[in-house]
Amino acid sequence: LDVKYKLEFLSILQEMKHQKKLTVIMSLHELDLAERISDQILCVNGTTPERFGTPQEIFTKGYISKLFGISSGSFDEKTMNAELPKPCGKPSVFVISGDGTGRNIYRKLQRKNIPFATGILFENDLDYPVAKALATEVISTESFEPIKGKTLEVAKVTLSECDHIICCRPHFGTFEKANEELLSYAKQLGKIIK
């Protein structure tokens, strides 16, 4: 089923379950849908039932990777993101992003097998989980706190070692002055900025 019909079908099942007090048993391979629709999940490893519980009990850090034997790429249980392996090597590109603006760039760089660094990202930023999965280096900082000077200095050193800079942000928020300073620093160094 395509996304539209899958959502309609699952919505109808959920409605029937509530109205008619039905128990619905499904075999789902779309983990994100299983997490959203299921009250209880049974995980089967090969032919053996391995774990039974609520979505919160099943989707714990590292469990899905272990269950499926994921050794190439990664799966983040918190966001339900599956990502291909990160490129290896020294980063040649530094990405200044945040607020979800970098995810498409990270994936494009991964597809081209270009190692990259990114920062400074707050650990609750939309870009952070994808950055952790795909970037060679992620300069991050605690959520809801101002960026520390030491973190900015680490970002400047990493940026100075990269050949190209990509800035995904049209402007920066109040707590992102360090990223604005990082962009100015890149310009001072004469880096190629896209």
Give the residues covered by each predicted segment:
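ABC-family nucleotide-binding domains
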Residues: 2
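Helical segment within the ABC ATPase nucleotide-binding domain
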Residues: 6-19
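H-loop/switch region of ABC-family ATPase nucleotide-binding domains
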Residues: 28-29
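A short, surface-exposed alpha-helical micro-motif characterized by mixed small hydrophobic
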Residues: 34-36
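Receiver (REC) domain switch/active-site residues of two-component response regulators
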Residues: 39
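Conserved switch/coupling elements of ABC/ABC-like ATPase nucleotide-binding domains
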Residues: 42, 46-57
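ABC ATPase nucleotide-binding domains
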Residues: 68-149, 167-169, 173-177, 192-194
